[in-house]
């Protein structure tokens, strides 16, 4: 036993610096701002005065800038955000939304058949859990290190990259306080083509699962019911995409989406605005095949203000 004591001491001396480095790294990663943590903070600060709340995925995140609303608005959409998290964010904030008049729910090509947990981006569930403090949409295994470690969540490779900047990193540097993130790289227009549009639609087709439908509709109905109890007007909006995207979509699915949303809007005085193929938008308004650029977002937000928030 006496021979083991020096070994244990050496082991402790070896592990102690490593443990300190790991703990320091975990703390720094936790403090590092990203779109989830920043949106949560901004929404908490502004929801009490907000008159318009926007929910949805990246087409809303990059396509709707509340700056151009005549009412005080905030955009709570995020990349690949599903109706489940739209619902959970609304539930979390609704009692503080004392002045909310309009709830804008954006619905895209894949929305009714999409859940994060059984998609290519299932890792995002843990971001909502870690940074929004929301219950994830699917049970996670206790053996998954991402449940406990920010190093595992961000991946060791990215963590090493952030460490070279001493974790002085903002992962959402262009996110405005109203929740909007502009897309301004003019060179991206070269990716707007029929070929790239097909690739994008193919990706979205791969995340469409019929079995998700019964769940997503239930989430949408719950969102509507929550808004009704607070006398908030619900508006469902389909954002515009460029023709290289919608011409490659499954036309039957587009029609089914439209009919379904129309039928929902017939109840409880819910309004539906379908801008998917709106001819007021041309190639110069788009960042890529299915996202508006800065100019397009200004145009779309102004249209929403004129045609919806009146």
Name the predicted role of every residue range.
Residues 59-148:
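Membrane-embedded segments
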Residues 47, 64-73, 226, 230-232:
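A short, Lys/Arg-enriched amphipathic alpha-helix followed by its capping loop at the start of a domain
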Residues 116, 120-230:
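Secreted/periplasmic serine-hydrolase-like ester/acetyl group-modifying domain
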Residues 51-53, 102:
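Structural motif
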Residues 29-49:
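Alpha-helical transmembrane signal-anchor/signal-peptide segments
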Residues 224-249:
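Active-site segments of SGNH/GDSL-like serine hydrolases
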Residues 2-4, 250-310:
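Long, positively charged, glycine-interspersed low-complexity recognition regions
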Residues 6-28:
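Hydrophobic membrane-insertion alpha-helices, especially the h-region
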């Amino acid at each position: 036993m006496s021979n083991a004591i020096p070994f244990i001491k050496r082991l402790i001396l070896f592990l102690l610096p490593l443990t300190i480095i790991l703990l320091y790294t975990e703390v720094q990663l936790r403090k590092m701002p990203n779109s989830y943590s920043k949106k949560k903070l901004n929404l908490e600060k502004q929801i009490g005065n907000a008159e318009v709340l926007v929910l949805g995925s990246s087409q809303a995140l990059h396509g709707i800038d509340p700056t151009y609303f005549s009412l005080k608005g905030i955009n709570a959409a995020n990349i690949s955000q599903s109706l489940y998290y739209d619902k959970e964010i609304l539930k979390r904030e609704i009692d503080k939304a004392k002045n909310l008049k309009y709830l804008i729910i954006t619905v895209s090509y894949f929305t009714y058949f999409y859940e994060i947990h059984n998609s290519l981006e299932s890792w995002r569930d843990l971001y909502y859990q870690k940074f929004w403090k929301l219950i994830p949409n699917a049970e996670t295994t206790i053996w998954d290190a991402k449940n406990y470690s920010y190093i595992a969540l961000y991946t060791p490779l990215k963590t090493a990259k952030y460490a070279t900047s001493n974790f002085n990193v903002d992962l959402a540097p262009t996110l405005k306080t109203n929740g909007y993130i502009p897309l301004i790289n003019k060179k991206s227009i070269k990716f707007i083509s029929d070929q790239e549009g097909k690739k994008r639609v193919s990706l979205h087709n791969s995340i469409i699962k019929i079995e998700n439908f019964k769940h997503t509709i239930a989430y949408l109905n719950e969102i509507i019911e929550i808004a009704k109890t607070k006398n908030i007007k619900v508006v469902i909006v389909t954002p515009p995409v460029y023709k290289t995207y919608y011409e490659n979509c499954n036309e039957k699915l587009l029609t089914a989406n439209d009919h379904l949303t129309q039928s929902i809007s017939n109840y409880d005085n819910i309004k539906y605005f379908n801008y998917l193929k709106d001819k007021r938008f041309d190639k110069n308004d788009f960042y890529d095949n299915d996202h508006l650029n800065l100019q397009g977002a200004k145009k779309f937000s102004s249209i929403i203000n004129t045609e919806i928030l009146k």
